[in-house]
Amino acid sequence: MIPLTLDLQEGFEGDQVVIAIDGHEQFRKSGIRTRLQIGLAERVRLDVEPGQHILNVSLPGRNTQGERRFDAASEPILAVSFVEGRIDIGPPRAPGYL
């Protein structure tokens, strides 16, 4: 297993967040809120098998979801933000994450 860190960053305002890997729910939590001082709402740590996966993040209360294919070995940390009405998933944008 390979550790995967998902940093829920900008735009969360008391949301319920659901995270699935390859169609299997791995995380569900309500009340996720971005702490503006640090630009982070929650750090989620999961273990995944090596190889390619599909990450799906949904905000049921906002009726939106985002999806991204990633490689567990080359992308051990991903950032998730809710920006301009959509979920953005990508590499961390703040220095010092690695």
Describe the residue ranges of each PLM region.
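Terminal leader/tail segments of proteins
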Residues: 1-98
